[in-house]
Amino acid sequence: MPPPPPAPPSEPAITPPGPEHQHGGGGLRRLIQAVGGGHSEADAEYQQRLQQPFQGTRHIVVLGCTGGAGQTVTGLMLGHTFAQHNGEPVVAIDINPGPGALARRTRSETNETLTGLITRADQIGSLTAMRRYTSQAKSGLEVIAAGKNPLQALDDRDYALAIRTLDRFYSITLLDAAAAVVARVLPYADQIVLVAPASADAPRAVAMTFEWLDGHGYEELRTRAVTVINGVSRRSMDDVEQAEAVARGRCRALVRIPWDDHLSMDRAPRNELKSLRAPTRRAYLALAGVVAGGFTVIPERYQDVQQEQEASR
């Protein structure tokens, strides 16, 4: 992270989607329009969203619109928030190796990696066996480390096997994906969270990311995306508003995360929710609540089952 800017805003903000995405779901619309900051009623609604049951499993891919956007820490805090408030088992996969990698931001309980999990997937018959490959944070979030070179060592079949294996034990899977593997993991995404920095680069980065998604057949996934502007301060408000102007009407919701120096890499592996400032925690609660609101959309892999159940009634 760059040096902290002065005077961060005191509260997070949730921006509503464009008119074309405001159909149905009155509760979700109110949720997105709510602004955090001492509003216990809004916080309660976020928590209620997180606790709503849903059918099957959900896969959330977290993507950075540009380098240094805060993709990894956003995925980590989103995972912590789900684990703390949802009550369902949550796992995050580190597929974005480097000095600031997901696994480096959490305490390590195992030397196993995603590669090892895939190699021995047929031997994982219980949650106890599964836990040999994960490290668990205090929030309850489990993290699978990337290994030395997952970008070249794993192919499409490997990722498919990993997802199938995790679906047996976890209700929510988050994938922190490097740019080199985005094309391999997006086919498994039920939702995407797009992260842009609160900087002058953000408007162009958001526009290019949307264009890439549309150009590669992910327009529908893009319309249901949640776009996060990360590291917001008063100094960056002009850049933030320009980025939001690009995204508004083209994604489901926009969420601002305020600057918080507790998220810096030199605080790792103590990047836990309790270490954050209250407005930052509230912003991540809002983000998780908005993402959870998208769980009402039944993934295509379950739609045939649902239709059969409805036909048998």
Positions of predicted regions on the chain:
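Phosphate-binding/switch loop-helix module in NTP-utilizing enzymes
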Residues: 135-138, 142-184
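Beta-strand-loop-alpha "switch" segments that mediate conformational coupling across diverse proteins
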Residues: 231-278, 282
